[in-house]
Amino acid sequence: CNSKGTPCTNADECCGGKCAYNVWNCIGGGCSKTCGY
């Protein structure tokens, strides 16, 4: 599984079971989902 901070599309990719938008990834206009947030 992927560690916290790793880009993801689904929660089941992540060790912590969370895949969500992180506000810091939205700076510059392009939001991306990462594991663990």
Swiss-Prot record:
This is Mu-cyrtautoxin-As1a. One of its GO terms (molecular function) is sodium channel regulator activity. Disulfide bonds join 1-15, 8-19, 14-35, 26-31. The presence of a 'disulfide through disulfide knot' structurally defines this protein as a knottin. Pfam families: Toxin_21. Keywords: Calcium channel impairing toxin, Disulfide bond, Ion channel impairing toxin, Knottin, Neurotoxin, Secreted, Toxin, Voltage-gated calcium channel impairing toxin, Voltage-gated sodium channel impairing toxin. Expressed by the venom gland. It is found in: Secreted. The lineage of its organism: Eukaryota, Metazoa, Ecdysozoa, Arthropoda, Chelicerata.
